[in-house]
């Protein structure tokens, strides 16, 4: 893999330094630009004139597939200087109505003795350099943080034919963008980011589809043919493993009081009919469940197991340790007030009182010039000697 012109700042990959050149505008995702600074051995120490604009990338397709217009908005930054650099961080949060409502509820509940905070998983960055020999499929709404705008680098949405392929990534198959050409790209993912190199065609790997950030390939046909959906052997016996009909309801269906066999009440008859109808409905639901699971398994889409895929080499795969789209937010509690009143009162530490004779000294100068020191509690004795 080529060395990128984008430099990671720090060891935790939370920020990147991007070069700004007059001939190459830099596209940075909205909200991710941290600062612009001057650098270099021959720099003047001042940032040159900066021009900032905006650009929409795959607006309509991203709006339909990611249900987000913000994922397509990028700031275009140009400069007249040669040694300016921009600092970029993946400052993107998962905004959604249900998450906003949850944060509102949490803010109300946090008025008690425990503070509750909701945080998204930590995001990291990964610089990528394209040399024109490999295309990259980048999955996720918020994965493209920055890229240089040149005549070669191009970002396109996933084609509909690739999205509908039987061996594609199923529900994740259409939620990616294709990066082609030559240039530098900055990716962002959740958790830590790692790259896996498959050296030849005999190498393969099974990965959870939700952890895939990007996959390289020589064209879309070659890339999608190398991805096999649900590589595990699925047992159809799992389809018959359905919760049994409630035994209590079955007993109700056979309920009949021997003492009142000749005079069953209307309520008892209603209970029997309701139990029989419930049993019939349950059997129908079980039948539909079995047929649905078996049909799904036979067509390569296992709805009862995690969405794993097998990817064949040779290619490079970039993965993230946390899920990009389905990772639930974590709720953590932190004590912001002591639990008891006793804990709220700090312990009083008594400082030992120093004795007076430990710091009051009496000095006597003799006629021969010698000086003697004597510790006394007070000067009463000395005064009495003199007077």
From Swiss-Prot:
Classification via InterPro entries: AIM24, AIM24_sf, Trp_RNA-bd_attenuator-like_dom
Q: Name one GO biological process term.
A: inner mitochondrial membrane organization
Q: What is its main location?
A: mitochondrion
Q: Which Gene3D superfamilies does this chain map to? A: Mitochondrial biogenesis AIM24
Q: Localized where?
A: Mitochondrion
A Pfam family per the record: AIM24
Its keywords, alphabetically, are: Mitochondrion, Transit peptide
Q: Which GO terms describe its cellular component?
A: mitochondrial inner membrane
Similarity comment: family membership: Belongs to the AIM24 family.
What name goes with this protein?
Altered inheritance of mitochondria protein 24, mitochondrial
- In its UniProt entry, the species of origin is given as Candida glabrata (strain ATCC 2001 / BCRC 20586 / JCM 3761 / NBRC 0622 / NRRL Y-65 / CBS 138)
